[in-house]
């Protein structure tokens, strides 16, 4: 069906009026991305990492728990995120929690969402991945002012300095990690490249390696028709690299619906959305010991 000029005009007017009807609609970002692209965010993140070093999280024992959530989409209702933080903080075997992206829903809510997280120097250390909603409305600089980096890694160790597990966070907020970040990951996992081959490059030094980010590899669920995953070529490159690098698990969000896939020697888990008005909402609790076990907890 061919549209008339009048119909095109009406659709154009409605398209331009959408931001006034829905503040979550980022027209400027849709037409021309306002936050820096992944290559620039990667560059800024690595510069920050170089200034602070690699974090080490002290865990209470060789068997410890990690609480994992994603897609809280905070705007005004913080019930589920608050309950998640409280549950993790109350668990004496949980030294760290992960948020897999889309901390906020739209513009202006990052400071409020940050106020819901454990404060710095809390016994519960929180690490975040960057989601697509977190960079809408040119929010990257604000997000970076709180969290510093969207691409980083850290490791856990016992009080006697015995190194245990490695966690690697990737920036996939645009549905790609880009060539520079891919090379960084390759060097980190395989030691093939220019990075110093100290603790960071030898996966045999670690009991487990977990990669976490926002974007998923696989999606059989179609409840979120608009969500996208990586291009097929990037999926092939990344999954092959994770297999070569001895990665145990890949944790992500974005699709809002749980999906668990064993592929190429690792387990990929899409964690359910945490947001309040998206029932049923869940978070994941992973227990790391000689094996990695996990279960999901549903909010009432």
Predicted regions and their residues:
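Short, basic, low-complexity termini and linkers enriched in Ser/Thr/Gly/Pro
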Residues: 1-20, 115-123, 161, 190-206
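Alpha-helical scaffolding within the catalytic cores
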Residues: 43-55, 79-86, 110-115, 138-154, ...
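Alpha-helix N-cap/helix-start motif
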Residues: 77-78, 178, 278
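His/acidic metal-ligating clusters that form di-metal
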Residues: 86-96, 162, 166, 175-268, ...
């Amino acid at each position: 069906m061919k549209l008339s000029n009048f119909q095109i005009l009406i659709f154009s007017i409605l398209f331009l009026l959408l931001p006034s009807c829905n503040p979550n609609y980022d027209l400027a970002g849709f037409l021309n991305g306002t936050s820096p692209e992944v290559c620039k965010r990667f560059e800024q993140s690595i510069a920050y990492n170089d200034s602070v070093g690699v974090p080490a999280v002290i865990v209470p024992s060789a068997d410890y728990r990690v609480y994992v959530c994603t897609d809280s989409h905070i705007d005004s209702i913080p019930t589920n995120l608050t309950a998640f933080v409280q549950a993790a903080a109350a668990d004496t075997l949980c030294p760290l929690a992960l948020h897999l992206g889309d901390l906020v829903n739209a513009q202006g809510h990052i400071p409020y969402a940050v106020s819901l997280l454990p404060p710095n120097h809390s016994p519960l250390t929180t690490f975040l991945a960057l989601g697509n909603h977190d960079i809408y409305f040119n929010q990257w600089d604000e997000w970076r002012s709180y969290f510093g980096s969207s691409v980083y890694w850290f490791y856990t160790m016992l009080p006697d300095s015995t190194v245990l597990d490695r966690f690697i966070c990737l920036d996939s907020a645009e549905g790609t990690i880009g060539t520079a970040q891919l090379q960084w990951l390759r060097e980190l996992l395989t030691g093939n490249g220019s990075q110093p081959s100290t603790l960071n490059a030898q996966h045999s030094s670690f009991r487990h390696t977990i990669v976490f980010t926002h974007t998923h590899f696989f999606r059989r669920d179609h409840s979120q028709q608009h969500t996208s995953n990586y291009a097929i070529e990037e999926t092939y490159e990344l999954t092959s690299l994770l297999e070569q690098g001895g990665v145990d698990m890949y944790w992500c969000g974005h699709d809002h619906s749980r999906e668990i896939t064993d592929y190429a020697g690792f387990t990929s888990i899409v964690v359910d959305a945490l947001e309040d008005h998206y029932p049923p909402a869940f978070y994941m609790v992973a227990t790391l010991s000689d094996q990695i076990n996990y279960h999901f907890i549903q909010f009432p």
